[in-house]
């Protein structure tokens, strides 16, 4: 189960992510948050709170995380006073329809068990005209695509991490209007911006 795996690695997560943070992930996190409009914001998969440092100080909203152990670390991190933390799965959000002006996630949907259900929930809880932004590693185009298809056999078994998802296509199929896709790192990372209609 994905939740149990993240509970088991929570204490080591930031150590593992450290090199990636230094090699450009910090910049990508900042770029992701820069795409968000002001208003009531939802973060899906806040993890240990690595994005909190990039939140504008006047941010208000909710940061969700399904791993209790990750959330126990996140709660110790400084964050804007208007941001609440909540343990929850992306596929079953406990919010009223049109509760948020925007939602975002960074490197989360590769591990979401039922992404179509989670995208449907984002479409429901973000108001019409609102924004959904994802920073995700995805199946790259070209010669790397089949390589990632092969790697996916092992990454899903070992880490429950899907490295070959076509995330922008899945978002579109769920009814989100994809307005921009920025490709990074040979297409392995995508910054995807959607509008809720």
Regions found by a protein language model. Name each.
Residues 102-114:
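A short SAM/SAH-binding and catalytic strip from SAM-dependent methyltransferases
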Residues 17-21, 133-191:
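C-terminal alpha-helical "lid/dimerization" subdomain adjacent to the S-adenosyl-L-methionine
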Residues 91-103:
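A short acidic, Gly/Pro-enriched loop at the edge of an enzyme's catalytic core
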Residues 191-197:
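C-terminal lobe and adjacent flexible extensions of AdoMet/dcAdoMet transferase-like proteins
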Residues 40-92:
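Class I SAM-dependent methyltransferase SAM/SAH-binding core
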Residues 116-131:
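A short glycine-rich, Lys/Arg-flanked "PGG" loop and its adjoining helix->strand segment in the class I
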Residues 1-37, 50-51, 70-73, 147-154, ...:
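Conserved class I S-adenosyl-L-methionine
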């Amino acid at each position: 189960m994905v939740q149990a795996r993240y509970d088991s690695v929570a204490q080591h997560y930031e150590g593992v992510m450290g090199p990636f943070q230094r090699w450009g992930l910090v910049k990508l996190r900042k770029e992701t948050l820069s795409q968000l409009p002001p208003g009531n914001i939802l973060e899906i998969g806040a993890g240990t709170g690595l994005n909190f440092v990039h939140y504008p100080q006047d941010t208000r909203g909710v940061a969700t995380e399904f791993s209790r152990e990750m959330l126990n670390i996140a709660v110790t991190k400084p964050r804007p006073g208007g941001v609440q933390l909540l343990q929850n799965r992306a596929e079953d959000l406990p919010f009223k329809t049109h509760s948020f002006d925007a939602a975002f996630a960074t490197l989360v949907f590769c591990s979401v068990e039922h992404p179509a259900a989670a995208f449907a929930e984002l479409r429901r809880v973000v108001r019409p005209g609102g924004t959904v932004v994802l920073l995700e590693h995805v199946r790259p185009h070209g010669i790397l695509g089949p390589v990632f298809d092969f790697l996916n056999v092992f990454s899903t078994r070992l880490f429950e991490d899907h490295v070959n998802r076509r995330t922008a296509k899945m978002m579109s199929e769920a009814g989100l209007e994809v307005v921009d896709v920025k490709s990074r790192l040979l297409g392995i990372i995508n910054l995807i911006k959607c509008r809720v209609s």
